[in-house]
Amino acid sequence: MHNIHRRNFLKAAGAATAGLVTANIALNAYASSVAPKPQAGKSVIGLIAPKMDVVRVGFIGVGERGFSHVEQFCHLEGVELKAICDTHQAVLDRAIDHIVKQNRPKPAVYTGNDLSYRDLLSRDDIDIVIISTPWEWHAPMAIETMESGKHTFVEVPMALTVEECWQVVDTAERTQKNCMMMENVNYGREELMVLNMVRQGVFGELLHGEAAYIHELRWQMKEIDHKTGSWRTYWHTKRNGNLYPTHGLGPVSQYMNINRGDRFDYLTSMSSPALGRALYAKREFPADHERNQLKYINGDINTSLIKTVKGRTIMVQHDTTTPRPYSRHNLIQGTNGVFAGFPNRIAVENGGFGQSYHEWDMDMQKWYDKYDHPLWQRIGKEAEINGGHGGMDFVMLWRMIYCLRNGEALDQDVYDGASWSVVNILSEHSLNDRSNSVTFPDFTRGAWQTAKPLGIVGA
């Protein structure tokens, strides 16, 4: 969506920086939000919505990410694009033009102010809503969507505070509606192959994972009045921690069956100095430019360590500032071997192709031939044609619609979205307390102990 309250956001960022003086108050509030809460309704683990012959879709936010979803949905069978909402007319026009050119009916349009999405939610001919807006709108919009009787699919992260995570979870339980945070990386070809290999025991008992979002995005600071950088830049002045943990953490969590037999227990976090964005602003903008008036407090590199209840460890890193190649790490280590991404490589002690585990096997084709995931075997070629981060976006959306039309549970639920997203705020709490460990809330309220593990999902 459009640059919502950007000036006010800047003021809030300054207030948040000043508020670090009262970190103990924040930590006390965090402690109370970790404590178990009364269940708002029946657990939604394994929730199956009634089958839908046709899935009727509404979109809140059709800017950069939202328009990508519109493009992908136009390639899916069994869907109707009923309505779109945004505060920026240009992106609405682009979305309408694309939908009509794909020989689909023109959708209803909602715009005018920041709350126009509520008019879209008031419709009774929409089954699911896709939310692709600035981060601060994700939780409020997800909550209102479920309360309007619709299933919710929200971009990452799902929420920005522990309390918001609880509110989204409680709403899903109370309304018995799906709320899936759309972690697309879980549907990448490599990630799904590794999930298949893990479930078949190739790596033995899992011990350790490494996840990251390492993506140099300083150039987004030049997006001043519109696009992602017009609002995302300010988060680097508002928080110090892992701002965006889910892309790397989602797949590793599913490898380890987090919330399905294991769960995150506690986290410790630390950040490097925050230098890169101020240096970039000084180099790329005039001295009196607003980008040079900001105080960037988010460390250029954040590293967090997570311990699970079963004793496994996960390293999670965030870096969108330093000049380096893209990586999500995507490492999973077990008692029999390891997979690591960027570049993809494997080493196993038993069950490999004759290569010593002291050396990396970089030839992925033979591993694909043996372990390529059923989803990619079925729709991989179509996904590669339609694109979307190498096809993972298409596979994710295809799978979502398949589950809704065939009466199956989604692969990611509201507890996953909350557990992966809350790393954002927990990393900040740990940093504010000299990197001491902080406890994860159990958003499942104990149900993780009996939840069915995520299998090798198919179609």
UniProtKB/Swiss-Prot annotation:
Residues that coordinate or bind NAD(+): 64-65, 86, 135-138, 155-156, 184, 244
Cofactors that this protein relies on: NAD(+)
Post-translational modification: Predicted to be exported by the Tat system. The position of the signal peptide cleavage has not been experimentally proven.
Cofactor note: Binds 1 NAD(+) per subunit. The NAD(+) cannot dissociate.
Keyword tags: Glycosidase, Hydrolase, NAD, Signal
InterPro entries: Gfo/Idh/MocA-like_OxRdtase_N (IPR000683), Gfo/Idh/MocA_oxidrdct_glycsds (IPR050463), Glyco_hydro_109_C (IPR049303), NAD(P)-bd_dom_sf (IPR036291), TAT_signal (IPR006311), TAT_signal_bac_arc (IPR019546)
Pfam family, one: GFO_IDH_MocA
GO molecular function, one term: hydrolase activity, acting on glycosyl bonds
Signal peptide limits: 1-31
Superkingdom to which the source organism belongs: Bacteria
EC number assigned by the record: 3.2.1.-
Residues where substrate binds: 213, 232, 244-247, 326
Family listed: Belongs to the Gfo/Idh/MocA family. Glycosyl hydrolase 109 subfamily.
Role summary: Glycosidase.
Protein name, per record: Glycosyl hydrolase family 109 protein
